[in-house]
Amino acid sequence: MSIGANEVFRAMTSIIEQLERTQMGNVSKAAEEMFQSLLKGGIVHIFGAGHSRAFGMEMCGRAGGLAPMKLVGLEDIAALEGTRGINLVELERDPHTAHRLMEMHAVQPEDAFVIVSNSGRNGASNELALECQRRGIPVIAVTSLEHSQHADSRHPSGKKLYEIADVVIDNCCPYGDVLLEIPGLTEKTGSASSVAGAMIAQSLTAEIIARFVQADRTPPVFISANVDGGDEHNRAIVQQYGHRQITY
């Protein structure tokens, strides 16, 4: 079996096509949940640990993105407490981390939460989903069902993320998150979840904006800070959400 750039493109394209073929209904349901929270004056919190943090960066504080989206991460705890002695892997697996993040970000009943975890097994993400469930806050999960269904939960409840969330978007990635065999090795390469996540994130953004337009409302969309007038445009939008610590 050959391996190279062309194989990466073919494998990733296959994942994206599978996403479009199987997950657009779930993307629509998730976008509706998020839109309804925004209509009620809430914001959408987006959590991902490790590489899953990239999903939130696709939706929060960037050109073409909606303003009332807030990135939530393990790094918030590290920044507050200082990096010395902080182990992000341990934080990701500790259910108590979820309660610290909920408090830090002052999550409100009208908000929504997107939780991104390829494996769907770790304590922080699953406890975050459970705590949102307890508070009546809608949870959208972005996860690999194939991986999650072949892995044991690390949460005390024994539950995995897809078993808790209100809406589940399957990123269609395989167990282990890699696509391409390496000749002569058991290891594989071609990590897929970040590429799939970027497509899902941009799809959600577009679906939410479409709902604003259909409702004859102006969507609060950022533009690039590196075009003329970008700072002024974005500053005016951020001021609308300053009480929720939204930044660009």
Q: Would you name each region that the model predicts?
A:
Residues M24, G42, I137, D216-R217:
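Residue-level recognition of short, well-ordered coil/turn positions
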Residues S2-A5, M24, A31, N126, ...:
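Amphipathic, non-membrane alpha-helical segments in soluble helical-bundle scaffolds
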Residues I15, A30-E33, L128:
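A ubiquitous structural signal for well-ordered alpha-helices
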Residues M1-T22:
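Generic N-terminal amphipathic, Lys/Arg-enriched alpha-helix
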Residues P183-Y248:
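YjeF_N-associated NAD(P)HX repair module
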Residues L39, I46-T205:
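Glycine-rich phosphate-binding loops that contact phosphosugars or nucleotide phosphates
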